[in-house]
């Protein structure tokens, strides 16, 4: 079964890579690089400079960004990068950069649409995401795509990677190396998860609002210190990444295609551009204009892939552990931290992994709950939340390869309705963007 899941993931991502990257390139060209022209304005938005009293929505721009970042900045940046380097070599990082660059435009389009076509319930509750975009903007004949996304999202939002890697780094400590530790740790983690996720989006957003920025600064600061102490190795590390991206020398058989596929797979898991998950929370943002949230959302690939993933990759490459270690995932990153910063480095990574892993589980629970609500109504949400709690335990005890392949398959399937609807409605986004930026220029 494990081999079948692995083969299926490889097959699906072979064709999903050109679809994701090609769509991003289309959005870049079609928008005439508009997202990049307004990066400064996007940063002003997350600082609340252009917010208005009475905006419709559940959470602020900053909360929406940090909640979405808690799903993207996390173990994908720490363990996902290690897995990419381990399986495909440093060259995979170059292709992760590519997904981030085109992903900036993709996120602008998908998240703008999520606000444009979101649902506002009678009680004022706001719901967004690809399924509502399809429901409210496309012909009724396209509704199967909405159900397809939500069904795939039920699996894609399960905390497979996070639960597995969180338990792995804790289990690496000598004190916890005993029989059935993974099961015991999974049960404890499931209990903590239940306390948070049963509180809904508002509680998740409040936790993410302070936890994600704090842990991001701690992690990035630690990596920055390690890089400064080894500054003479930074340029050679970049040279290794770029050279390996076009040779595939670190992959068995020297396949460049394998390097590209792995880089895009891990890039998609890192920044989620084009997958549709991030639109679920950005669609709930308090905003008077959809374009504002599209601008805020497009910052995610910059933070999580271009900054965080690159930092982790440089750390692992400079440490040299990727050449000599058989460790996998978060353990390989931990060895790199220990090699460059000693026991203190490991301690910092441990704190960050626990925090990031937990916050990502909380965010993914909201993603899955939103899909469940669309398919089954409010009664389905509570049931699905208990399913998440159960699967925290399940994924804690299965091999990392199985956990990550299951999520990768689901992500690839979720991208299909997301990108179809976004390409279809791209002219609507451009029309809204022109209105917004014209008004912005007149007011300045």
Give the ranges of each region predicted by the language model:
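Hydrophobic transmembrane alpha-helices that form the core helical bundles
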Residues: 87, 96-100, 104-119, 124-176, ...
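Membrane-interface loop-to-helix entry segments
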Residues: 19-23, 27-43, 167-170, 181-229, ...
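Extracellular/periplasmic helix-exit of transmembrane alpha-helices
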Residues: 110-118, 122, 223-240, 254, ...
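Transmembrane helix-loop junctions in multi-pass membrane proteins
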Residues: 16, 30-35, 76-81, 157-169, ...
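N-terminal alpha-helical transmembrane segments of multi-pass membrane transport
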Residues: 1-75, 86-92, 103, 393, ...
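Transmembrane alpha-helical segments of multi-pass small-molecule transport proteins
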Residues: 17-22, 97, 146-151, 174-201, ...
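Alpha-helical membrane segments and immediately flanking helix-loop junctions
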Residues: 53-87, 113-131, 135-137, 148-151, ...
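Selective recognition of specific alpha-helical transmembrane segments in multi-pass small-molecule
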Residues: 102-110, 187-201, 212-232, 265-266, ...
């Amino acid at each position: 079964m494990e081999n079948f899941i692995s083969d299926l993931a490889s097959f699906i991502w072979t064709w999903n890579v050109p679809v994701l990257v090609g769509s991003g390139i289309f959005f870049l060209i079609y928008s005439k690089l508009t997202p990049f022209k307004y990066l400064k304005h996007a940063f002003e938005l997350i600082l609340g400079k252009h917010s208005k009293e009475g905006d419709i929505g559940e959470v602020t721009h900053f909360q929406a960004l940090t909640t979405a970042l808690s799903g993207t900045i996390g173990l994908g940046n720490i363990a996902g990068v290690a897995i990419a380097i381990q399986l495909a070599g440093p060259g995979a990082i170059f292709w992760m950069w590519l997904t981030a660059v085109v992903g900036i435009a993709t996120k602008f389009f998908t998240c703008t649409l999520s606000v444009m076509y979101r649902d506002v319930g009678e009680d004022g509750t706001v719901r967004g995401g690809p399924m509502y975009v399809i429901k409210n903007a496309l012909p009724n004949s396209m509704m199967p795509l909405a159900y397809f996304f939500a069904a795939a999202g039920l699996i894609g939002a399960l905390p497979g990677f996070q639960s597995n890697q969180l338990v792995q780094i804790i289990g690496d400590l000598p004190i916890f190396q005993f029989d059935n530790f993974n099961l015991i740790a999974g049960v404890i983690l499931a209990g903590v998860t239940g306390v948070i996720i049963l509180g809904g989006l508002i509680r998740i957003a409040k936790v993410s609002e302070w936890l994600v920025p704090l842990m991001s600064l701690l992690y990035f600061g630690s990596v920055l210190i390690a890089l400064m102490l080894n500054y003479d190795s930074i340029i050679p590390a970049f040279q290794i990444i770029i050279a390996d991206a076009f040779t595939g020398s670190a992959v068995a058989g020297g396949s460049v295609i394998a390097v590209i596929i792995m880089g895009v797979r891990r890039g998609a898991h890192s920044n989620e551009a084009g997958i549709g998950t991030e639109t679920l929370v950005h669609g709930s943002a308090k905003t008077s204009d959809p374009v504002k949230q599209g601008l805020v959302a497009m910052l995610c690939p910059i933070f999580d892939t271009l900054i965080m993933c690159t930092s982790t990759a440089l750390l692992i490459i400079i440490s040299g552990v990727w050449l000599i270690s058989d460790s996998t995932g978060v353990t390989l990153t931990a060895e790199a931290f220990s090699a460059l910063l000693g026991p203190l480095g490991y301690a910092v990574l441990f704190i960050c992994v626990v925090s990031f892993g937990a916050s990502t589980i909380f965010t993914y629970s909201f993603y899955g709950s939103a899909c469940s609500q669309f398919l089954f109504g409010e009664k389905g949400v509570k049931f699905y939340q208990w399913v998440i709690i159960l699967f925290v335990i399940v994924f804690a005890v299965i091999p990392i390869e199985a956990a990550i392949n299951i999520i990768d398959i689901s992500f690839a399937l979720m991208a299909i309705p997301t990108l179809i609807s976004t390409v279809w409605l791209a002219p609507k986004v451009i029309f809204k963007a022109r209105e917004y930026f014209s008004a912005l220029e007149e007011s300045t």
